[in-house]
């Protein structure tokens, strides 16, 4: 079922730069469904009751506007989310600093950024740390075995992780390794909307640390027009039976701050993830500079990859369907220099549509469809692949304005 849903236009939206008809500016895709097959099983994603700015004058929910105080704001943010329906992050006072993951407590919440709101981890990888890791030869160490016992008594299985953590303990003097908790949001609730926020992590590094943003059992959530960079473990992972979520118009990237493990998006934490969950739509997203793998790597769920843009020339694998996954891949654009953009391992079904476009051949072999054709239970249309680069580069990320 492919009707012209993407030609709709939400004229009421004030917080928007809508110069492309492809941006619906409202929840769509799997987040609006309660079944992976039944189109009549719908869900009304409302968040805290509003996802636009300015807030409508007749809105009766609880709203709070947060500004940075220049210090660790984890508790401030966590309490604001707990006590309010709509949480507005106003970036006019600078970055919001967070020491470790903020747990989103309570269903039916909207988190909305204005004035270039950035949520940043307190810890970050420094040039001194990177130099020490290089001098020790960490990039050439084993990532499967050969570990040891750290000065704090912790046993580590892998050689690269062991030496990385040992070096950071030595440089920082932090035997508790609190830096490994560097992340920003953890969501395990229902009906959550996150829009127009930039999330900045400490830099990717192989220490078994936190993701920048993680969905652990989150359901019916819409993440739209956000930017993710330099997550320690992943930029945005969706696991632990999360279900019916949509990620749209977001950007994923890494900077020189990141060192190893630039694995951006994981769907399903392992092959043991329970089946029947993790149904997710990715539409009009941009996997850009520095991304190496997991764009996304997919286990278990039914995943719709629609009109996404891939430009990372460092990629060793972009879309990677794996155990028990069903994946529909349509209208995506792989830029020149992206030479390893698809492989699959033990997927149930993959539909690789003719509407995808790659500037270069895939070094892992020409993608092909396997299994039963994959369908999704909602209306949509596929934008021409030629429109994708310009539309996504201009409008994806935290680009909405007042």
Residues of each region from the PLM?
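Extracellular beta-rich repeat passengers
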Residues: 297-402
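All-beta strand scaffolds that present successive hydrophobic residues in beta-strands
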Residues: 111-113, 168, 192-195, 221-224, ...
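Oxyanion-binding "anion nests"
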Residues: 294
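Extracellular "leader-to-stem" segments immediately downstream of a signal peptide or signal-anchor
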Residues: 2-4, 19-86, 95, 128-157, ...
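Right-handed parallel beta-helix
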Residues: 95-276
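Hydrophobic h-region of N-terminal signal peptides that target proteins for export
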Residues: 10-18
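Residues in short coils/turns that link rungs of repeat/solenoid architectures in beta-rich domains
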Residues: 201, 230, 254, 259, ...
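Low-complexity, polar/charged sequence tracts that form flexible coils or short amphipathic helices
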Residues: 215-216, 228-229, 238-239, 258-259, ...
């Amino acid at each position: 079922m492919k009707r012209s849903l993407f030609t709709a236009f939400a004229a009421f939206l004030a917080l928007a730069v809508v110069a492309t008809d492809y941006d619906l500016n409202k929840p769509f895709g799997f987040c609006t469904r309660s079944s992976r097959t039944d189109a009549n099983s719908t869900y009304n994603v409302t968040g805290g009751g509003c996802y636009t700015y300015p807030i409508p004058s007749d809105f009766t929910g609880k709203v709070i506007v947060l500004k940075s105080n220049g210090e660790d704001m984890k508790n401030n943010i966590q309490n604001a989310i707990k006590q309010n329906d709509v949480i507005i992050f106003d970036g006019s006072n600078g970055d919001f600093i967070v020491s470790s993951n903020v747990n989103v407590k309570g269903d039916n919440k909207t988190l909305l950024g204005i004035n270039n709101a950035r949520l940043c981890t307190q810890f970050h990888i420094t040039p001194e740390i990177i130099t020490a890791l290089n001098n020790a030869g960490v990039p050439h160490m084993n990532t499967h075995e050969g570990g040891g016992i750290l000065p704090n008594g912790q046993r580590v299985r892998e050689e690269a992780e062991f030496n990385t953590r040992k070096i950071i303990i030595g440089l920082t003097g932090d035997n508790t390794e609190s830096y490994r908790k560097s992340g920003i949001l953890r969501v395990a609730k229902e009906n959550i909307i996150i829009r127009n926020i930039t999330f900045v992590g400490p830099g990717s590094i192989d220490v078994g640390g936190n993701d920048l943003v993680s969905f652990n059992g989150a359901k019916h959530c819409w993440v739209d027009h956000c930017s993710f960079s330099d997550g320690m473990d992943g930029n945005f992972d969706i696991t632990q039976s999360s279900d019916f979520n949509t990620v749209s118009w977001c950007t994923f990237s890494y900077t020189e701050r990141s060192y190893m493990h630039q694995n951006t998006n994981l769907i399903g934490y392992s092959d043991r993830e329970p089946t029947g969950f993790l149904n997710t739509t990715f539409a009009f997203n941009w996997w850009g500079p520095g991304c190496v793998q997991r764009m996304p790597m997919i286990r278990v769920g039914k995943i719709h990859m629609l009109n996404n843009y891939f430009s990372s020339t460092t990629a060793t694998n972009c879309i990677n369907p794996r155990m028990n996954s069903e994946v529909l891949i349509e209208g995506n654009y792989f830029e020149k220099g992206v030479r390893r953009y698809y492989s699959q391992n033990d997927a149930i079904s993959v539909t690789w549509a003719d509407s995808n476009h790659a500037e270069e051949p895939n070094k892992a072999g020409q993608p092909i469809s396997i299994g039963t054709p994959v369908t999704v239970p909602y209306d949509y249309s596929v934008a021409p692949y030629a429109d994708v680069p310009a539309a996504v580069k201009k409008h994806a990320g935290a680009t909405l304005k007042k």
